[in-house]
Amino acid sequence: MGSLDSNYDTESPASVGQFNPLDPEEFRKQAHCIVDFIADYYKNIESYPVLSQVDPGYRHSRLGKNAPYRSEPFESILKDVQKDIIPGMTHWMSPNFFAHFPATVSSAAFVGEMLCTCFNSVGFNWLASPAATELEMVVIDWLANMLKLPKSFMFSGTGGGVLQGTTSEAILCTLIAASPMHFEIVGVKTSTSFVVYGSDQTHSTYAKACKLAGILPCNIRSIPTTADSNFSVSPLLLRRAIEADKAAGMVPLYICATVGTTSTTAIDPLSSLADVANDYGVWFHVDAAYAGSACICPEFRHYLDGIERADSLSLSPHKWLLSYLDCCCLWVKSPSLLVKALSTDPEYLKNQPSESKSVVDYKDWQVGTGRRFKALRLWFVMRSYGVANLQSHIRTDVQMAKMFEGFVKSDPRFEILVPRVFSLVCFRLNPISGSDPTGTEALNRKLLDWVNSTGRVYMTHTKVGGIYMLRFAVGATLTEKRHVSSAWKLIKEGADVLLKED
């Protein structure tokens, strides 16, 4: 795959006139081949090991050391994808992928992504692509309505939203927006006195975003959680931490709550945390990256109760709303704070619509300047499937997780460790109640390795409250009940093998 010849400058380049990187007819031909390739990939995806079986550094023997000097046939490149790339893939689209929260796919999002790539607009301001900007505003409000968010978060009200890449970016932007507010209101001279708060279950992206925002690592507070509260954060402990910091002369800046933590889908009490945030004048952000999508279903909406008192909310449709990575919605009540903190105004971007302040320039709502036309994906998904089908998709995943939970409960050798809320089941093999915790952990590590080594299923683990547990996350677009049943049979088979060895 690729040429090993590194003497690029010893040959004359091909005639410039022969090179056309965007020939419409050649594109049509190649695109047909790619669509067939992709359709066959999805059709045959169950034949691949879910977890890649290659060793680190496998590229050295397969992918070549240098880029080819001469062009290579499209057909040869596609063959190399099959031969060299797919073996190195962990197949997130596999119906037997039960590891991390999913990155969902759909035909509608795929078509939207194709158009996004086709237009290749760089929509940093309204004038650069009016359709990209205004369609994004539309789908942001559509999803807000689906979630029954208050008007204070919507363009049709007093707020607004933006499509970020990931939760990390969303949190980073709101942290940056919160800082100037405190510089002015509290009169802080330096960010070294800022303190931010989350729990020991808050996603690691929060700590990363805090560091990027200039928050000292020693000023990132992680409030401990316990099984008694199903690992949701305690407002009382949070209040005590803030009081201690204020007494030490520190300045509380930001609270990050979570609806659906990664380890166990714990749900923080938003209304009670909003009381704390209000009492101390700190920015209150809610991370609902995974579980927030479920709140388009009326039976799950109560998990967002209290969101009307938050300053910002982030949610990732690429996790559960069939919209492909990357797609993270960020809503803010005060867009002006975001714009003030992130805006740039170089002469070469000045234009009448921007100067009039009558349009949204999304470059001022994000870290970067350039941005893709990602709203097309969400627009196609929402229009192609409608709210009813998206709700059905989520409910089906939850029902399959409930089915798996029932399997676990029916086998006395296993136990459920935290209550299932959405489509994640946390469990472990514990054949002898009260057995040595170290031995139980070792047994479950072996079970996880045994299951994943088969290539037939891929799961992950977590450790919460000192307990090692297995995570079974249902959500891949192609997953059906038969895949869940087969996964359980494989897990039981692994347990049989390991317990016989003991």
Curated annotation (Swiss-Prot):
Keyword annotations of the record: Decarboxylase, Lyase, Pyridoxal phosphate
Expression tissues: Highly expressed in apex. Expressed in young stem and bark tissues. Expressed at low levels in leaves, fruits and seeds.
Leading EC class: lyase
CDD domains in alphabetical order: DOPA_deC_like
Keyword match Lyase: yes
GO BP terms in the entry: amino acid metabolic process; carboxylic acid metabolic process; indole alkaloid biosynthetic process
Catalysed reaction equations from the record: L-tryptophan + H(+) = tryptamine + CO2
Cofactors, names only: pyridoxal 5'-phosphate
Protein EC: 4.1.1.105
Region (Disordered): 1-21
GO MF, one example: L-tryptophan decarboxylase activity
Spans traversing the lipid bilayer: none
Protein name: Tryptophan decarboxylase TDC1
Organism from which the protein derives: Camptotheca acuminata
Organism placement in taxonomy: Eukaryota, Viridiplantae, Streptophyta, Embryophyta, Tracheophyta
Gene: TDC1
